[in-house]
Amino acid sequence: VTASPPHLVIRPIEARDFAAVSLITVESYRPFIRPDDDYFALLADTERRASASEIVVAEVSGQVVGSLTMVEWGSPYADVAQQDELEFRMIAVNPRARGHGVGTALVEYGIRVARARGRSRVVLSTMDVMVEARRIYDRLGFAEAPDRRWHPAISVLTFPLHRGATGQRSQQNSADDPRKVTESRDF
């Protein structure tokens, strides 16, 4: 008898998820940020972030294992978004859930949200030392935008969503409207 693979669900965050998302986000960023950095307070304040942005969680077998924060241009949480772009912030996956496609599923979900909203591109900042995350972004077709780099250790990556774009997954599919369904899949 073989066990079924865990079932992954991506859904909007609920208040009951705030503590888990805070913990996962802080733990995900801990290896890359100095312990005394004020950024930890921002990472941990999921409730406040949820009031000014859109957060989705990845859940496996009823447990939150990751999250993605999406912000529009002009949001207090937008760092690099320009008009007509959707910015991804604070992408986090529980270290024990890594390597199972959770991060990729969250990023792909966010890309579908951006397409459904008619945005021209997705944009995000990432640290060069976040090797696992960079592999996901590179594999999906994100490209570095050196002219938008705002810190020597942080890259700005973009993913074009318009027709003829260079990203591997740039073809729009009208069935991919994330507002209509909560994504779930086995991994």
Residues of each region from the PLM?
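Conserved glycine-rich acetyl-CoA-binding loop
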Residues: 90-108, 115-117, 128-135, 139
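Conserved phosphate-binding and hydrolysis motifs of nucleotide-dependent enzymes
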Residues: 62, 66, 101-103, 141
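Extreme N-terminus of proteins, especially the signal/transit-peptide cleavage junction
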Residues: 2-8
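Generic N-terminal simple sequence motifs
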Residues: 1-2, 174
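Acetyl-CoA-dependent GNAT
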Residues: 12-95, 107-109, 113, 146-150, ...
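C-terminal "cap" of GNAT-fold acetyltransferases
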Residues: 7, 24-27, 55-56, 84, ...
